[in-house]
Structures are given as structure tokens and as C-alpha cells.
């Protein structure tokens, strides 16, 4: 595991400990189990692909550790609405505060402003966070293979499924992909960022593509910023994309989405 992930996970453990003091696990579990129906995250992606369109998970992201603030004029509801109007299949909302300046409130605001299913983008290491995700309205959670052992992944996936949430499992290399494929979720995200060097290359997705079984839905993540990138990936039969930074820097994120994917 990289140093940055070690640091992030330590912070998450402390955040969870503090959250449990404010709201005990039994309470958050009861809240999660009493929530209304989720939106179909996997179904939304498959519907776009069946229609011959790219399935875009559009990210609502204020900042990143490496780039700082991406968007000063940051209004999650407006961003989400624009994404929905311009062809996004789903949303991804950062809820990590310390490293990405995210917020639970951002997810709530984004989800309330449109009908799209929403991924809680955070570093999930504990069951408490899964219950929390359901309470805030998430329809899907992210499990990062680099942050978890196999038993943890399996347990968190089972809990998410029991709460009617989808799971996107994220990998960075072939060894992580092999571990991810032990899970039941159809959603496999390949992150194009090298966790050791932080360099980004679409070759990461293209090199692992053939090792993803046909019954899984591959989502390529990071480094997709030009129509040429999209063309290259779509020609390789990659149909689902998670994109944030390229949109966050644009005047209108939804318009930028339509332009990048040829949906305008």
C-alpha cells in the first residue's frame, strides 16, 4: 500500500471513531435499514450502453490532493442537474473532507437535484461507512482493493448488497483485478493512475481489458480528458467512464460532458 493510502486510512479510522461517538452504530444501522428505495446504479449504466451510448459516471468534485481546488464556484445541485441534462448515466460525489474537500451534504444536495443514481466516492474501510452511505442517500459505494483485504471487501460488499446498494470495486493493476473478480459485483473500475508514481495512462485500462470477464461491466477511471481519449477507449469496447476533473474545470460541467463524449 502506498504512503498516501496509509495516511488516508488512518484518518478514516479516526473519523469513524468520532462519528460513532456522535451516532452509535446501532442507530446508524437502524436509520440505514429504514431508508426508501435506492436508484438502480448498474441498470442506469447498462441502459446507456444498450442504447449505444457511453455510460458516464460524472463526478462532483471540489478539490484533489494533487491539484488543489478544481472549482471555486462549487454548487453541487447545479452541477448534478447540468450533468443529468447533458447525458450522464450516474453521479459520483466525493464525501471525503480532509483530502478532497468533500462533504456528505454535497451528496445529499446533488442527489436531491436530479433523478440520477449516486456513488458515494470515499475510502470505505468499515461497515459504519456503508450504513452511513445508505443514510445519506447513496445508491452505490466504492471499494478500493488497495485499501482492503479480501475478507474486508467481501464483508463490505455483502453489507452494501443487503442495503440494496451497488458496489464499484476499483483496481490499479492485474494483481488487484484478480482479487476484485472474487467479488460478486458486476462493476469493476480500472483506475488509470499509478498509485506509486501518480502518473496517469489509459494504457492501464487497455492492458487489463482482456482480463475482465464478459459478465462484468468495466468502468475506466482517471485521465479521460479529450475526445481522442474517448475514441481510443470506445474503439477498444470500453463503454463506461468515470470522469470528474475535466468537467470541474469547465464553465458548465454538463456542457463539457456532452462535448467530451459527443452527446451535444
Curated annotation (Swiss-Prot):
One of its GO terms (molecular function) is phosphoribosylanthranilate isomerase activity. The keyword Amino-acid biosynthesis applies. One of its GO terms (biological process) is L-tryptophan biosynthetic process. Transmembrane segments: none annotated. Gene3D superfamilies: Aldolase class I (3.20.20.70). Keywords: Amino-acid biosynthesis, Aromatic amino acid biosynthesis, Decarboxylase, Lyase, Tryptophan biosynthesis. It catalyses: 1-(2-carboxyphenylamino)-1-deoxy-D-ribulose 5-phosphate + H(+) = (1S,2R)-1-C-(indol-3-yl)glycerol 3-phosphate + CO2 + H2O. PANTHER family: INDOLE-3-GLYCEROL-PHOSPHATE SYNTHASE, TRYPTOPHAN BIOSYNTHESIS PROTEIN. HAMAP family: IGPS_B. Belongs to the TrpC family. This is Indole-3-glycerol phosphate synthase.
Amino acid at each position: 500500500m502506498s504512503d498516501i493510502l496509509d495516511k488516508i486510512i488512518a484518518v478514516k479510522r479516526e473519523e469513524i471513531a468520532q462519528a460513532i461517538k456522535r451516532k452509535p452504530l446501532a442507530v446508524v444501522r437502524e436509520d440505514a435499514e429504514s431508508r426508501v428505495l435506492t436508484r438502480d446504479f448498474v441498470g442506469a449504466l447498462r441502459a446507456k450502453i444498450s442504447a449505444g451510448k457511453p455510460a458516464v459516471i460524472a463526478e462532483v468534485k471540489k478539490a484533489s490532493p494533487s491539484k488543489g481546488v478544481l472549482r471555486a464556484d462549487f454548487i453541487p445541485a447545479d452541477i448534478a442537474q447540468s450533468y443529468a441534462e447533458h447525458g450522464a448515466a450516474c453521479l459520483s460525489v466525493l464525501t471525503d473532507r480532509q483530502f478532497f474537500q468533500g462533504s456528505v451534504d454535497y451528496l445529499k444536495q446533488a442527489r436531491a437535484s436530479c433523478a440520477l443514481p449516486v456513488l458515494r466516492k470515499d475510502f470505505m474501510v468499515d461497515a459504519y461507512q456503508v450504513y452511513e452511505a445508505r443514510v445519506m442517500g447513496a445508491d452505490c459505494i466504492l471499494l478500493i482493493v488497495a485499501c482492503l483485504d479480501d475478507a474486508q471487501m467481501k464483508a463490505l460488499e455483502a453489507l452494501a448488497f443487503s442495503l440494496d446498494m451497488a458496489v464499484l470495486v476499483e483496481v490499479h493493476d492485474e494483481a488487484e483485478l484478480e482479487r476484485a473478480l472474487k467479488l460478486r459485483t458486476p462493476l469493476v473500475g480500472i483506475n488509470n493512475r499509478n498509485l506509486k508514481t501518480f502518473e496517469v495512462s489509459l494504457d492501464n485500462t487497455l492492458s487489463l481489458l482482456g482480463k475482465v470477464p464478459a459478465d462484468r461491466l468495466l468502468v475506466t477511471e482517471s485521465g479521460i480528458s479529450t475526445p481522442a481519449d474517448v475514441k481510443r477507449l470506445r474503439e477498444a469496447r470500453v463503454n463506461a467512464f468515470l470522469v470528474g476533473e475535466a468537467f470541474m474545470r469547465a464553465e458548465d460541467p454538463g456542457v463539457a460532458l456532452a462535448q467530451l463524449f459527443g452527446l451535444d
